[in-house]
Design a protein with these regions (language model features):
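Acidic/histidine-enriched, beta-strand-rich ligand/metal-binding domains
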Residues: 2-72
Length: 72
């Protein structure tokens, strides 16, 4: 089952969707681009959800750290 969060504290990220069973994170950026990240541990996802700056957390802990693909 996926959980979806609207991101309020970021100029980069709009929404995230996380599937704990599959450990996939789908990130929707404010410009409309969507990427899917694979093998993302649940603690990384929740860190993103509670971060003071979701964009900074994403850049430090997710971007270029996990395999990903652009969602068309």
């Amino acid at each position: 089952m996926s959980e979806i969060w609207e991101i309020q504290n970021s100029s980069q990220l709009e929404k995230i969707e996380y599937d704990e069973f599959k450990q996939t994170l789908i990130v929707t950026f404010v410009r409309g681009t969507v990427y899917k990240y694979f093998d993302v541990p649940v603690y990384i996802n929740y860190g993103l959800v509670i971060a003071d700056s979701a964009g900074s957390y994403f850049n430090k802990n997710i971007a270029r750290k996990f395999k990903f693909k652009k969602v068309e």
